């Protein structure tokens, strides 16, 4: 993947000509009726950001949700890009806390799959995971 992602984010990789790899995770979320989605981008995110600007494809509600895109904030105190998924979540905890959602789904934007996140959530609740 290194060669493929030198000039674009992995989530923006074309799949079958008209899709991007992130489309599968976003479609899964939309089909699972998730209304508020945060995307944490890191580097080479221009083409991914351009693609995400057309978020009408996934119909994330604007009144009670929406599609939120976060890039790393590099400051004098923090000169790092995200150092993995856990760090991206940690640096954006304020978004998660202010969302007032009882549950959060964390999914990768570089995998191609179809999943009903409601079934996953039901299982986790049932097992008290």
Give the positions of each predicted feature.
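A phosphate-binding catalytic loop at a beta-strand-loop-alpha-helix junction
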Residues: 1-4
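Conserved N-terminal catalytic core of the sugar/cofactor nucleotidyltransferase
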Residues: 6-10, 14-123
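A short, conserved acidic/glycine-rich loop-to-beta-strand motif
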Residues: 127-129
